[in-house]
Structures are given as C-alpha cells and as structure tokens.
Amino acid sequence: MNETLSGVVTRVTGATYIVETGDGPKVRCRTVPSTVSENEGSNLVAVGDRVEFRPKASETEMAEGVIVRVEERRSVLERRREVRRNRSKEKEQVIAANIDQIVLITSFDDPPFNSRLVDRYLVFAESEHLPLLIVVNKIDLDEEGMVEEDLEVYRNLDCNICLVSAEDGRGIEELRELLRDRLSAFSGHSGVGKSTLINLLVGREELRTAETSGKTGKGVHTTTSSAMFQLPGGGYVIDTPGIREFNLAGITRENLRFYYTEFLRFMPECAFSSCSHTVEPGCAVIAAVESGRIDAERYESYLALLDSLDE
C-alpha cells in the first residue's frame, strides 16, 4: 500500500492519532521517524492538523495508517508544558491547529466570571489575528442580570459575546449560528460547563462532565486530550483540555501594549514612543485611565499581565 490519502486529525491520545477523510472510515494512525512536518518546534501532530497518511494492514476492526506528512498550520492554540527531566524548562504544546475562532467558555458563577482570564485570551487572539467569542454559561443563576456589569467593558470593545444556559437551553441556538461553518476551539477553566455545552451542540453524549468541587470551589478537569466533533448543520468544535497556564507565545513586555486595543488611539500622544504606560511622565494612556476614557480594571489587568511576562 504505497498510495497516500489526505485527512484531518480529529483526536490525539498519546502517540495515537485518529484521522478522518470525510466520507471514509476513521483511521488510527501513528507517526514514524521519517514523518515530515512543515511546522517548526512544538509537537509534531495536533487536533485540526491536515495530514497525508499511508494506509497499512490492520489486525483490528479499525483501519490503520502511518502519517507521512503534516501540512503547514494556518493558526494554533498553544499552552506550556513542563519537560519532566528538567522542570526549569518548558516546551510549547499545540493543542489545536487550523482554527477559525477561539471560543472561551466562562460562567456567571460556580466558578465566578474571571475577567483576567478573558483579558489573557483577548491578547492571544489579537496576536494571532483570530476572532474570540466569549461565551458566558450558567446565566440561569443570574436572575438580576449582574453579569452585564462584567461584560460592559467587553461590549465597549466590540467583543463577540453570547450568553447561554446549558441548564435551560437559553442562547444555545444563537451559539449554533456563531459556530456554523467554522472550526472553533473551545477553551476555558474547568467547571464552567464546557463539556456539557459541547454535548448539547453535538447532540449526543460525547464528553464526560463534572461539577465544581465543593471543597475548593474550582472545577474538576474532565478533558485530558483534545478532540474534534462535527456539528449538525455545519461546523466543527475542538474540545481542548483545561488550560492551567495559557501560553502567550510571542507576547513580550515590549509588545503587550499593542494588544490592548483601547490603548492604540492614545499611544501616539505619549511623550515617549517607547512608553510602557506604567510610570512615564506625559503618558497619554495613563491620562486616559484617570479621565475614565480607558477602563481602570482593564488597565490594572494590563499591569498584572505585564508583571507576569519575562524580562
């Protein structure tokens, strides 16, 4: 069997990759030392990768193959992972490839809405030129509409926002439309209802779910590997593991300011072209914060994220 076929990786479990060709059966594939990749660094294969594979004889009911080439990725979602033999080092891990948009699942409560997490994703999405859809789940717990206070700043930034309830179905059809004909990477902290929402959207119980831990108030992780699912009516979703440390690859103390888009119109007025918008005299961004033209919480978020970046 020397012919090669093309397909998309829909699941990654360890060193095993499930590839789908469209109309054909799923194929269980592995890589070999001669596998060629057009992507430098990070892991060789990720969910969403387009690959060429060579079928091989199988002793099981499921077809098997060998991946011979991984095509260049249009976009990636990454996180950092520790290199076990030397925990002082980290390596980038691609957990989703060739995505059209990032869908950040948050919740009104249990766990509470986390604006700092939203800001990290906004920075990443801006840096990767990817749209971010902010989904707020569990709005059935928000009888007084309190979440709108948290969302006002993001609405003012023209962010895409969808309010849903996996419990009573509110907003699910609107969310379907926002996902139609796109490859969307679902991400977010555990406990926000990500797996429950995917099960609703896909129309079958594909993923395990878990409630928030009563002891810690934090979610219990149920996703341990990435997987891609087709949506009825068009589109695909990639379920990604809970990201404990979202990787802002390429974001530095020098360029972070460019990804807080509300800063951009004030930056040319700063006294110094290299202004970090922290302590410099004549900073137009700080003046805009003081006058209320830039949201103070967003500015504090910028300072916190700036401090977390390597020198």
From Swiss-Prot:
Record's subcellular location: Cytoplasm
UniProt cross-references to SUPFAM superfamilies, sorted A to Z: P-loop containing nucleoside triphosphate hydrolases
InterPro entries: G_CP_dom, NA-bd_OB-fold, P-loop_NTPase, Ribosome_biogen_GTPase_RsgA, RsgA_GTPase_dom
MF terms (GO), sorted A to Z: GTP binding; GTPase activity; metal ion binding; rRNA binding
Keyword rRNA-binding among UniProt keywords: yes
GO biological process, one term: ribosomal small subunit biogenesis
Comment on bound cofactor: Binds 1 zinc ion per subunit.
Keywords on record: Cytoplasm, GTP-binding, Hydrolase, Metal-binding, Nucleotide-binding, Ribosome biogenesis, RNA-binding, rRNA-binding, Zinc
Residues annotated to bind Zn(2+): C270, C275, H277, C283
Major location category of this protein: cytoplasm
Cofactor list: Zn(2+)
HAMAP family referenced in this protein's UniProt entry, alphabetically: GTPase_RsgA (MF_01820)
Entry similarity comment: Belongs to the TRAFAC class YlqF/YawG GTPase family. RsgA subfamily.
Quaternary structure annotation from Swiss-Prot or TrEMBL: Monomer. Associates with 30S ribosomal subunit, binds 16S rRNA.
The protein's role, per its UniProt record: One of several proteins that assist in the late maturation steps of the functional core of the 30S ribosomal subunit. Helps release RbfA from mature subunits. May play a role in the assembly of ribosomal proteins into the subunit. Circularly permuted GTPase that catalyzes slow GTP hydrolysis, GTPase activity is stimulated by the 30S ribosomal subunit.
This protein's name: Small ribosomal subunit biogenesis GTPase RsgA
Organism: Chlorobaculum parvum (strain DSM 263 / NCIMB 8327) (Chlorobium vibrioforme subsp. thiosulfatophilum)
Gene symbol of the encoding locus: rsgA
